[in-house]
């Protein structure tokens, strides 16, 4: 492998960093955006800002690669985790991303704990019921924004959305799935009981 472009989708900016096979940083492009704080509990971002950031940083990176006559072998994507974006079958976003630091889903955490002990939940998922993670946010959408939940084809994370923009495919990986509270860390598969008690389908 000669060169790899790493896309890091953070909370305040997207960074595109080009490395050679020795790990030397060859070029860095970045694009800033912001979160919307609607209250002490509600934190959202417009996913279109990530699209704009992706286009801008890829363009700058491509110009550097072309000017220096380099070959790009791979693109890797990493991101903030546990944020939730509802999208339709065509990949259109239906609501702002509910961000990882959003705390609106405390009641949904209580709903989970009413059906499964914290100990059992931790054994299955490696996580404790907390609004930080994805599934309480998904449950909040179902409870409080039902029309959006019903229209959604998928509820995905930030990294998954960027991969979709790059490839047109809806995929995730263990590093993202494990922050949803829906992945069983013992089997590395979706946990049927967590899906059932959360009501996420």
List each model region and its residues:
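N-terminal glycine/serine-rich phosphate-binding loop of ATP-dependent small-molecule kinases
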Residues: 1-95, 123, 151
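Secondary-structure boundary motif
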Residues: 63-67, 114, 143, 147
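Short beta-strand-loop/turn "lid" adjacent to the catalytic site in phosphate-handling enzymes
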Residues: 65-99, 128-132, 163-184
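Hydrophobic or amphipathic alpha-helical targeting/insertion segments
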Residues: 89-93, 111, 115, 120
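Carbohydrate-associated surface elements
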Residues: 102
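Short, charged, surface-exposed secondary-structure boundary motifs
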Residues: 37-41, 107-111, 182-184
């Amino acid at each position: 492998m000669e060169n790899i472009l790493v896309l890091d989708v953070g909370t305040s900016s997207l960074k595109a960093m080009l490395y050679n096979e020795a790990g030397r940083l060859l070029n860095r492009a970045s694009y800033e955006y912001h979160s919307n704080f609607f209250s002490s509990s509600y934190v959202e971002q417009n996913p279109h800002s990530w699209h704009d950031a992706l286009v801008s940083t890829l363009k700058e990176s491509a110009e550097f690669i072309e000017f220096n006559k380099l070959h790009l072998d791979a693109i890797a994507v990493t991101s903030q985790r546990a944020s939730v974006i509802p999208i339709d079958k065509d990949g259109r976003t239906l609501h702002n991303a509910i961000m990882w630091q959003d705390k609106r889903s405390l009641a949904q955490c209580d709903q989970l704990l009413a059906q499964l002990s914290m100990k059992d939940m931790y054994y299955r998922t490696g996580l404790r019921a907390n609004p930080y993670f994805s599934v309480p946010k998904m449950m909040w959408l179902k409870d409080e924004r039902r029309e959006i939940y019903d229209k959604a084809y998928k509820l995905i994370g930030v990294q998954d959305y960027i991969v979709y923009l790059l490839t047109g495919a809806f995929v995730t990986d263990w590093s993202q799935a494990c922050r949803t509270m829906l992945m069983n860390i013992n089997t590395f598969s979706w946990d049927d009981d967590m899906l059932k008690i959360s009501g996420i389908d």
